Amino acid sequence: MEAIRQLEKEHMRLDLPDFSSGDSVKVHVKIKEGEKERIQVFEGVVLKRHNGSKSTAATFTVRKTSFGIGVERIFPLHSPSIDRIEVVKRGLVRQSRIYYFRKLTGKAAKIREKRDR
């Protein structure tokens, strides 16, 4: 069991910013097309984080609206395919899983910004 924890600790990424559900983020993902590798940016609102950040199995779900259609993508937090994560805006939400955000459209889909004091 200790060997597994040691192996997980080696694969953990320490360069990731602290973010939570409701935050607007830009996820820079490495995509391999043939022999070329490029970076694609997926920008949206974090709906949930799964398994926190202590485990290599930690994931987070990001939702964006593209041409009027909602697109959700689940990213492994410690994946080597993620180049970097930028927090664009901190959101003020009361729940840790904001699934109700899927049903909202227009101005109702706005999330208030968390102010730093």
From Swiss-Prot:
Q: Which InterPro entries match?
A: Ribosomal_bL19, Ribosomal_bL19_sf, Translation_prot_SH3-like_sf
SUPFAM superfamilies, per the entry = Translation proteins SH3-like domain (SSF50104)
Q: Which GO terms describe its molecular function?
A: structural constituent of ribosome
Q: Name one GO cellular component term.
A: cytosolic large ribosomal subunit
Tell me which stretches of the chain form a coiled coil: none
Which cysteines are cross-linked by disulfides?
A: none
One biological process term from GO is:
translation
Tagged with keyword Ribosomal protein? yes
Is Ribosomal protein included in the keywords of this UniProt record? yes
Which keywords does the record carry?
Answer: Ribonucleoprotein, Ribosomal protein
Q: Which family does it belong to?
A: Belongs to the bacterial ribosomal protein bL19 family.
Mind telling me which PANTHER family this protein's record contains? Answer: LARGE RIBOSOMAL SUBUNIT PROTEIN BL19M (PTHR15680:SF9), RIBOSOMAL PROTEIN L19 (PTHR15680)
Q: Function, please?
A: This protein is located at the 30S-50S ribosomal subunit interface and may play a role in the structure and function of the aminoacyl-tRNA binding site.
**Listed NCBIfam families:** rplS_bact (TIGR01024)
Q: Which HAMAP family match?
A: Ribosomal_bL19
Protein name, as recorded: Large ribosomal subunit protein bL19
What gene name does this entry carry?
A: rplS
